[in-house]
Amino acid sequence: WREKLEAEVQRQNLYQERVAHMESSLGQARERLGRAVRGAREGRLELQQLQAERDGLQERREALEQRLEGRWQDRLQATEKFQLAVEALEQEKQGLQSQIAQILEGGQQLAHLKMSLSLEVATYRTLLEAENSRLQTPGRSSQASLGFQDPKLKLRFLGTPENQHLGSVLPVLSPTPLPSPLPDTLETPVTAFLKTQEFLQARIPTLASTPIPPMTEAPCLAKAEVRAQDAPLSLLQTQGERQQAPEPLWAKATASVSTGVLTELEEAGGQQPGHFPEDATASAPSLSPHHPVLEAKDGDSTESRGSSIFQEDEGQIWELVEKEAAIELKVESSLAQETQEDGLHTEEIQDSQGPLQKETLEALGEEPLMSLKIQNHETPGKENCNSLRSVDENQGTLKSPEEEKQTLLKSLEEKDVEVEKTLEKGVPELSKPLGKEDPRIEDQELMSPEGTLETLSFIGKRNEEVVRSSEEENIESLAAFKKESQHPLGCPEEEIQRVERLIEKEGQESLSSPEEEDQETDRPLEKENGEPLKPVEEEDQLFETLIEKEGQESLSSPEEEDQETDRPLEKEEDQLVERLVEKEGQESLSSPEEEDQETDRPLEKENGEPLKPVEEEDQLFETLIEKEGQESLSSPEEEDQETDRPLEKEEDQLVERLVEKEGQESLSSPEEEDQETDRPLEKEEDQLVETLIEKQGQECLSSPEEEDQETDRPLEKEEDQRVERLIEKEGQESLSSPEEEDQETYRLLEKENGEPLKPVEEEDQRVERLIEKEDQESLSSLKEEDQRIVKTLERENWESLRSLDENLDTVMPLESKNQKPLKSLEAEEEQRIVKPLEKVSQDSIGSLEKENVELLRSLEDDQITESLLKKGTQESLESHEDRNQETQDPQRFLEEEGQGIVKQLEKENQGFLGSLEEEKVVKRSLERENHEPLSSVEKDWVTESLLERESQDSGKSLEGQEAFRCLGKEDPESLQFPEVQDQEIQRSLQQETQQTLGALGDEQMASEPPEKVGPELLKFLGNGQEIVRSLEEQNQESLVSVKETSVETAKSSDMEDIEPLKSADEDLEIINSAGAQESLWSMEVTRETTRPLEKEVQESLGFVGGNQEILRPLERGNEELGSLGKWNLEAVDSPEAVEEGRQPLGEEACLEMGEHQEPPRSLGEVEQGLPGSGNQQKWEDRAVENAAADQGPTLGRTGIESEDEAELPLSGQGEKEEDAEERELQLDAMGEAWSLASSEPQEPRVPSEGGSAGAPQGLEGQSEQVGVLGVPVGQGMPEVTEPLLQEDVAQAGKRDPIELTLGSDAATRAGLGLEQEVAGSGGSRHLAREEAIHPSLGEESVEAKIAHDLEGPGKEPKEAGALESEISELPRTSSDVLESKGCKQSEPVLGWAVEEASVEASDHEGSDAPEPRPSETEGDEGAQAALAPPGPKLMEPCSPTPILKDAYEWQPQAEGTRETGRQLEGGSASLERVEDEQEFGLGGIPEGLQDWEESREESEADELGETLPDSTPLGLYLRSPTSPKWDQAGEQRLSPQGEARKEGWGPAVPAAQGLSNPPGEEERGHDSDLSSEEFEDLGTEASLLPGLPKEVADHLGQVPPGPEPECWDQGGESDGFADEEESGEEGEEEEHEDGTESGAQWWGSGPSKVQHVTQRGDLQEHESVGISGPWDDGWRGAAAGISVTGLETESQDSAEPSGSEVSESVSSEGEDQAPDHLDTPQGVTNVVPGAGDTFGISGQAPNLESEHMNGRLENGLEQSEGQGVLDRHQDQGHPSQQQEVGALKAPLLGSPVHRGPSQSLEFPLSGADRDSWSSGED
């Protein structure tokens, strides 16, 4: 009985114990439930806040977009008005020209009439005298008749010497008549002249009694006929041509000569009747140059009569006529020279000299010289003639060309002043006056970049030719005068001396005329600029100082830019100086300059005028440039400049540095806008400059990177140019249309001015100077322009050398000819005169020869220097490559370790799969239960976060608006000029920078080893990454199955162990703790990243143009994304969607964290007391918040950053292009992974959605929204926002999932379209991918990239500093967030791969021009995608299998989803948000997807169960690497793996690319074939990766598990996430160890761990990431259910959640199907290059991509610049918001962290990339 009693007691005790235990468990469960409910409420509140904030941001974006469009319209209107004014002026000019021509013709006719009258009078006098003599001596009647005949004969024969005498006298008379006839003729009615001419011609026949007048005209006609008959036809034809072309000149010369002749004839006639006919005959021959034409036109009878008469005296008359013609030509040249001395401009002199020389040559019979001169002068001469005509017309209008030029310059000056004022007043006003003024200037600039270089070379040629012509004319005039002296014209030697003096003066003037022209051009420019051009040197110095100040003051005032823009006008000299400097820079700058100076010196000697001002200016300019170059040497760009310095050493470096300073400072300033605006112009220049610079850079930087870049550049350039042209056509259609109109107007002006082109040339030079100044302001543009100009100058120098040689040749033959006639000259004085002239010519020739030799030597020296530079660049590139390879080696090692970790984690996960699945099932139910309240909480929380973000974003948007306004103000100027220049310069700078990156690469490679690594390395890395991808994909497939099983088991076990409430509470706590840690991590990473990013930002300042250009499309994409964001907001509004997003997000976040943190973070988060999971929750929240933020804030942020980033896109687009190129290269490195995977598709999707331009705007919009959201969050809501953001994100996740689902469909479609576009952009994307891969090599590069991205855009310097400060201010929460993001990045690597592919797709699809930026954007979007992967979506990407299923499902849908994918670009942000929301829990996610994701999360939880204690909140477990916390944890885990992560990012991105590689490739198919190829290459590399079964690598294809960081980059998106989870777990420990480093290490060598973590996480995630496909499927289903467009982003979001669930379901399948699915994504990638890519990853990643792309297009692109900074701020400022945003940004942050690789990528998207990153971080 006692035993029974005791047994009963024991039973009771046991029951009591059980009851107590159950009660305690119940209490714990209730506590968890209460926490989960609270978290859900908070999430709801934050979601509501985020939604409200997003709405506000959307409104702001819309307002900003409207404002921007209004400005564009104003600019277009102003441009149209300006064009109309220009057309009116041109018409007026033409009318004046015709009037002048008529007046000249009338003057000629009057002169003929006077001659005929004088001849008639003389004839009558002779008759009267003969009659008188006969009457007086009637017996001498016969003698009288003979006497009468004798005068006639005398008139015929003696007329010849007297004609010659008149010819000699003409110089005396003509100097004054030449200028005087014009005013006189102008005063004289044309009709009177015509009548008089007709009357004269009419009377000539009636002068039967006066045979002399007919003879007189006969000699003229006879001369014409004789010339036609006896004279070489070439002479006559040449004369005819000259008469036709230079006819005004002839008319002027003839009129002046005729006037002088008539004056003499009248005087002589009054004195000597015999001399009148002779004089008349002489003047008739002088007139004959026209006269053959005029009289031939006027009457053939006279001509026939003249010819009959002439036939009598044919021989003598012909000789006389020939001599007279030569003399006349020489005299005319001398007269023209004297006239020039009298006030005619050197241009006129040159112009007149050209035709005079031609005529003289013709008269001399110097046909060869004529042909040469005609050829040389036909261009310059015709233009000179045209300019002389215009000058004559101007003179005829009593306005000297100088006056006209001054007027034009004054108008231009006034316009510049007005432009400055308008710039000061505002961009809208600026756009109008700029549109009016600058369009012409822009057109002139457009023409000036091309035309100006041509004009410079042409001017140089013209000057040389003018000098030649002056020398030749002098020589010819001397020869002619000698001939005349030999054929005693009866003209005193004094006249000959005078003529020779005039010729010498003329030669000096002509020699100095180039200089004078330049100076005169500068003078009008000075007049216009209100500043003397000689002070142009001072101005150059001032300009350099101003540029430095402006660069230092970030181009504080638009006026300075305008002044600098005016200075560019002044820099016509400066351009000449630049030409010299560039010649020297190309020819060691100094030697060409010295040669030019030497050339100028002999010219000075010849000209008797010192060219020293120009030389001094050049020297000063070069000195300033050298100083600036030396000053800016410190910066990486300075290194680039140093590399370029040999080419551009002084000016280019100085300009680049100043421009860098300005660009860096003004990148955030309107300069970006201006650059964008100006980029159309600049792009033309930049394209020219890029072509030159590419040539130079390719020559100088023949390194593999340069070769790759050059190889890619042709493609990129073509694509970029095409894209830029398309973007310019789109974004700059307004600009380019005004610019084209301006160019057309400018061309018309050139046509008008073409005749006085010199004013236009001066304007062109001025415009070039403005452009150069603006280009200097946009260092890259200046650098490129400088290089281009240097090349042009070199060419011009060569041409000038050639021209000098030709001149020497011409002068030498002329000298020889002249010497022969001079020798023949009997007059010693004439010989003396000729000798000095010969000496002068010989001296000039000798000096020219010496100069030529010196120039040749300098060119040789330059070539040697270039070869040395090339060698150094190649060596530096090789060292970079070595470093990259070394970086890749640790990455591969890390990847291998990560793969091993992933395998271990897989085993552990498999062990925990059952328990995790059970826990996951329990957790699913709990989470479902929790997600409902959580969805409301998330909504509240997301709303709060959104509201906070909105408030902060509003603050930042206001800042952004202010910055945008400032930028807008500065931009209008730079929009018109720097834009094209900046674009071209940015291209050239991109090229140069890319080339210089070789040199800088060594230094930058430390920070951006992948980035700096040459495209070859990038390609190599891409291949290795592809191998790694395949390995990672294989590993990820296995890991995905294991992970899915583990996650499901972990989830089930966690669900069981952790009651729903506890799991929910713990999820929230984990999210919060993970968010906090992630925020800390992201803070650390952000700090670390920001520091290198700041460096890179400074470096990327040159790329700001490209970023700005990219931002333009980003702005467009933002606009599109605005709609997407609206859809996202709408989707976010749905609690269910938020809950869905939140469930998968929470699950994924837990899974992600669990998986990601399992090895490291299980310990780390357990060690961190689930702070990691709290952080992960925060990450999830942040992901949700970011989902909401990406969607809502993306919209609002798009509005805000749309402006900022629109500005950044505008100003930074060119640089961003450069950055895009470099970053494309870098992004191709690391971006091969993420850029391929996600970057582009996102952007492409958005572009597909709204079109290429719209996509960039949408991207920009989202980027801005996300960026604005990110920044405000970063600033205002450091940690409070974090929970709010978490809640908001949770809510946003709930809403966003639907949004994302819808948006993802739309985004997928967009992604398809974009990917198609991206396919075109593949080359650049591939480069970007490689760059992305390389950036993934080193976190330094990531940080540098981030810093570069932060600093990269114009606002990069400032915002980078702010971000840096914020980042530093932000507790390591941001670093943690970044690190967590890094963890996410490990997972997001997938997202990145997807996003990069999306970005690449969006980049290339979004805009071909922004392609580079898309590369960055790819990186950014890749980061978003990668960060988005931290959400379930990322986990899905991390789950190769689900991705594969999804990829299969998606890939069929991929094509449609591709289209949606492009829409998903918009939706990708939504998907990203969905991920984040899914991390928060996508309550709205279909239960199937939720179940699938939950199962996936359970499997991940199982893995986490192994690594994390059951007590670890499922939030940790379920926080998949995709979860913000997972990402944070993962990022933190990956932080040791941060390098692995970085690389892992790259590899993870490749993994994502591998997973998304099908999508990525398809994206790349859209994005670029390179993208898919790179994915395939990455897959191949992945297959080659050690530790990964080739089969796995094949399956992973482009998602190599992560043994190789590159593989991670390449294929390891899913694998990257799987690895990232594994390595994130290992790396979690390492990350806790390396924590801060890991951010860099992720980027650096950490990828392997990150890859392992990511691969493991990816495999786990691929279990969940498999969802990605299912996401895409479910997402597509949801998207299909929801409006693809409106819900496109939502589609992505819900699709992501659905994908998460699907990933879970697929993860189960994916385990089995993982290889198949991975293969399938690849297959689908092949099958659906666009869709498959997007959907391969888009299956998981396209959603991520789409989401990230969407968020990243929205956030990624726009945030690329603004958001990168803003998001970075957000990461820093609002750890929780960051973490929420980190959930989004984690996907995006993966991209920001990936952005670290993106650093390496240093996209021109630096700003946009940062924004994308920030959005990614958000």
UniProtKB/Swiss-Prot annotation:
Keywords: Coiled coil, Developmental protein, Intermediate filament, Isopeptide bond, Neurogenesis, Phosphoprotein, Ubl conjugation. Residues 292-303, 400-427, 434-443, 495-508, 521-536, 565-586, 599-614, 643-664, 711-732, 744-773, 868-886, 1342-1361, 1401-1416 have a biased composition (Basic and acidic residues). The keyword Nucleotide-binding does not apply. InterPro entries: IF_conserved, IF_rod_dom, Nestin. GO terms for biological process: brain development; embryonic camera-type eye development; positive regulation of intermediate filament depolymerization; positive regulation of neural precursor cell proliferation. Residues 1-14 are annotated as: Coil 1B. The modification Phosphothreonine is found at residues 137, 160, 210. It comes from the Eukaryota. Residues 15-17 are annotated as: Linker 2. Constitutively phosphorylated. This increases during mitosis when the cytoplasmic intermediate filament network is reorganized. Residues 18-135 are annotated as: Coil 2B. Residues 1698-1708 have a biased composition (Low complexity). Residues 1490-1505, 1570-1579, 1616-1636 have a biased composition (Acidic residues). Residues 1-135 form the IF rod domain. PANTHER family: NESTIN. This is Nestin. It comes from Mesocricetus auratus (Golden hamster). The gene is NES.
